[in-house]
């Protein structure tokens, strides 16, 4: 037992190293609170869709809406089909399994970054295969779902586990099965899965390089680099459309 002044404790804390994860990120809480928060948001949005169709209409992404409402590229990743409970059920189960694992491994900041970047990459990759001309009815086909981000996390697990000498055979099997199902089950945006996978692998690769060289700057440079590439692809898609690039914003 003893008494310490507040200033003494503060000065002592300055000299202590903050705990970090195995990948050099800032360690978070013992429980995957960020993963739980993302799941809660998705569930609340889905419940809102049950109450009013307007919720789906306000957050879903359609190619023709991208130039005027670009935030839909990201908000659509927090919504799911209101008529298919298995859609949100599978995505949230997968997110809980891999999300909690990665959150503890990467730290909450890097984990949030990879989730958002891969979610955006999934939407943009799907966009690349769609018509964007407002005069084309297909340009108003909506997309929702967190699967782009989930597949991005799948890829990150494989890359990071390989770097750390851990087994990922089970994850490879899951990706293979879902890749086949994407071509068998109708209305599955396999393009979003592909975009998320590639983006997740690239970001995870940057994290492994950052760990090897003990340079957090490399990790964030990699994350921002993938984000920049995704944005360029989206802008390029609209710029090369028959109607030209519409103002983003």
Q: Where on the chain are the PLM-derived regions?
A:
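N-terminal TM1-TM2 helical hairpin plus the immediately adjacent luminal interfacial "cap"
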Residues: 31-144, 183-191
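C-terminal transmembrane module of polytopic alpha-helical membrane proteins
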Residues: 1-27, 183-249
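Alpha-helical transmembrane bundle and helix-membrane interface signal
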Residues: 104-105, 157-172, 208-221
């Amino acid at each position: 037992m003893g008494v310490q002044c507040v200033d003494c404790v503060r000065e002592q804390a300055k000299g202590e190293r903050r705990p970090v994860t195995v990948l050099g990120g800032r360690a978070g809480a013992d429980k995957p609170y960020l993963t739980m928060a993302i799941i809660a948001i998705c569930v609340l949005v889905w419940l809102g869709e049950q109450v009013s169709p307007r919720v789906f209409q306000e957050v879903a992404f359609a190619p023709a809406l991208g130039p005027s409402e670009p935030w839909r590229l990201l908000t659509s990743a927090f919504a799911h089909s209101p008529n298919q409970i298995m859609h949100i059920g599978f995505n949230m189960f997968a997110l809980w399994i891999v999300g909690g694992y990665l959150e503890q491994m990467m730290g909450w900041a890097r984990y949030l970054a990879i989730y958002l970047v891969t979610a955006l990459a999934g939407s943009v990759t799907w966009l690349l295969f769609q018509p964007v001309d407002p005069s084309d009815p297909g340009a108003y086909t909506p997309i929702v779902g967190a699967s782009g981000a989930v597949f991005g996390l799948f890829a990150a697990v494989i890359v990071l586990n390989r770097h750390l000498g851990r087994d990922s055979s089970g994850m490879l099997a899951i990706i293979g099965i879902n890749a086949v199902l994407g071509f068998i089950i109708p209305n599955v945006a396999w393009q979003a899965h592909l975009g998320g996978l590639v983006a997740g692998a690239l970001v995870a690769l940057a994290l492994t390089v950052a760990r090897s060289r003990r340079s957090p700057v490399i990790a964030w440079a990699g994350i921002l680099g993938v984000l920049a590439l995704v944005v360029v692809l989206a802008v390029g898609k609209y710029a090369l459309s028959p109607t030209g690039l519409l103002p983003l914003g």
